[in-house]
Amino acid sequence: MPHITHSEFLLEQLKRQRERSFLCDCTVSIGQAQYRAHHNVLAAFSEYFSTQSVDAGREDPTITLDPESVSSAIFEKLLTYIYTGDLNMDREEIESVQKAASYLGMPEVVARCTLSQDNIKNVGSPMRQAEYEDPRSPLSPDDYEPLEPISEVEERELLREDRAGDDLVSMDEAQSSSEQTPQRVGKRGRKPKTRLYEDEFEVETISAQRGRGRGRGRPRGRPRVRPLSSDSTDQSPAHQAMSPNGSSTSRGSGRPRGRPRVRPLSTANEDPRNVEDDPAANKDQEVEKGNEEQKKETGEKDDGKNDTDNPEEVTAFKRGRGRPRIKPVSTEDQTTNSENVTTNAEDGSEPAKTKDSEGTGRKRGRPRSKPVSSEDPESVISVEISGEEAGEETSQDAEKHTEEGTEDSESNPGNSVRISKRKRILSRKLKESQAGDEEEEEEEEMDDEFENDNEDWAGEEEVKPVQDKHRPICNICGNLFSEMSSLRRHMRIHKGLKPYQCTLCTRSFRQGNQLKTHMRIHTGEKPFTCTSCDSRFAQKCQLVYHCRMHHGEEKPYKCEFCGAAFATSSNLKIHIRKHSGEKPYECGECGKRFTQASTLMYHKRRHTGEKPYICDTCGMAFAVSSSLIAHNRKHTGVTPYICLDCGKPCLTAGELRKHMDVHNDIYSLKKHSILKHNVVPELETTQTSKTDPTQCPLNIPIDHQGLIARVRSALVDSQDHEIQMEPPLPILPPETSLTIQQSAEPQMIIQHADGSEPSMIFQHAEASEAPMLIQHGEPGEQVSYVVEQYEIPATAEMEHTQIVIVQTID
């Protein structure tokens, strides 16, 4: 993957945001064409937009350009240049682009347009111009001189490539000859092929002629030739012939791609005399190998010189990138290996790699082992700092550890191989995740990682188990999540981002599945069907709620205060607010508070007058969706609510509850019977109701409610009241004449509570003992009263000792 600079990455992200109209807060209008863009980006490139953006503000984000000065086609090119840095224009468009750039105040574009029109045919970005100026890049057809035919140039390029191919073939032949030389034998008895890399100067010359291509099979961004450390001081003549100035001694043979790496014995190619004289040669090799690796990684070029000057100090094996380090083995293994190497060297045969020596080093992809307790870390550090002195100290330490290792190996042979539990756990994970042939870049990262682990392990006394991966946590609210993707979706709540927008109603959502569910409202799709009835739903949660409400399924959410059960947790949460009195939703207009957000929304529509729900049949609008549903039942004739007592159909549940009051109130039933069925109620019912005046249900006009309440309270508070029981009241016919006499000391008063009508003062005639029926008002709108007289003790609140209770008869 090519390296992308910070500026290129920023431009690419801004371009993608503009293409998606994400965070675009400016609209540029040219005639009928409109372009969405970002204020700050336009203002950064244009002086015109920097002034217009301030004047426009938030109320009017549209900026209109003059089509005569800036056409839509030219503005598209300039807009592309602003967001990408590429300005592509033909010779005929240079003048128009220059005019538009001058109008918009873009001096950089004006400077480009002032160049010669003959030399500007396709003005690109500065990056592309640098590629054209690079002599190593392939020539484009426009760069050839017009007098030279293009066909001849192509033939010349083909000849150059063929010549470079011949050079590579000669290198392959030298490689095949080098493969015939005796090599180390792998642990399975195979002889891995060894390929000699070409000289740096020759390969760089060939690659420069052919262009900047990467080698076949090599990863992107990796050089074709990589110097390796020497695998052996004894090399074949073919090796020495291919490496002038003895440079091949400092380079080793790499394995072909796809071939397994073979880790040689620490004494495989070493002089037998050195093995016999120095029993700690393995550790010297490991330390020297680490020194050479550090020099090679830091870019030092004096590896070959140091190796040739001191051939005795050069170890037989030097670890390349990703190669395992060798752990010192016990004395028995070292002695056995030394004897085997000496015997094989005298016979002239290749020393074989044994299983014992194989187990002491880590395989490819395994972590470096932690030093055992018998090893002295200070000796390792001293060896890395100095040369011969470090070797002597290491030899002494090795002899000391050999004596200890002999006893340990006899008692428990596994101590010399297994180091720690942590190593075992990490090795298994890495072996599973890194199966197959890994890239060398990954091996370098592993080396760096395990080197840091070795530093940590050097200071540890006890082996600690591998800790689990930390769960992602929100740094704002502290919520924990199982995955980073869940945390990213959660952060949209705090940032207020809703990137998913509906194209039909412009509603926005935080997640894509929310938009998918919302689209079912427009399409009418209802994929979830109830198994008990034919109801269908757009969401699964709606189906679950339906089954719990209408089909007897258990309601799992119960109130801890009153025991009421609910189908959803949200309904329970709203119900608990009734007990706590919490009303978190407040109206900004009048300050009224509500327990639900939906109730607040409906309340706000009273202030604004908004009625978004419109009937498709008659066009009537409503503020609440339930009102529209009840209204549609008038057109369809559907009456889902029916009274069980009389069978009356009702449109809504509220209408049914209001109707049930007729059956529960005896006087309301009497009124209903008289009005609807012309049936006079029986007198026994009236007589029975008079036995207790305090419990007498009276149905009187609303303006007499206050008087009745005072009468009942007076009757209850009085302990010595006596009620004069009268015979059943005869209702006089309307034509009966009544005598109403004026009196200064009235005995009976009828007065409306609101004072809308004048007081009526009357009394009985001397010869009359029965109550009378009084009618007053205009003809056609007369109100009839049945007068009943009660004698009660006078109180401070009552003005008269006699109170009249009246009942209206329709």
From Swiss-Prot:
Residues 386-396, 435-460 have a biased composition (Acidic residues). Coiled coil: none annotated. PROSITE patterns: BTB (PS50097), HMGI_Y (PS00354), ZINC_FINGER_C2H2_1 (PS00028), ZINC_FINGER_C2H2_2 (PS50157). The keyword Transcription applies. Keywords: DNA-binding, Metal-binding, Nucleus, Repeat, Transcription, Transcription regulation, Zinc, Zinc-finger. GO terms for biological process: cartilage development; negative regulation of transcription by RNA polymerase II; regulation of BMP signaling pathway; regulation of cytokine production; regulation of immune system process. A motif (Nuclear localization signal) lies at residues 428-432. It is found in: Nucleus. Residues 254-266, 318-330, 361-373 bind DNA. Residues 24-91 form the BTB domain. Its main location: nucleus. Residues 270-308, 350-361 have a biased composition (Basic and acidic residues). One of its GO terms (molecular function) is RNA polymerase II cis-regulatory region sequence-specific DNA binding. Belongs to the krueppel C2H2-type zinc-finger protein family. This is Myoneurin. The gene is mynn.
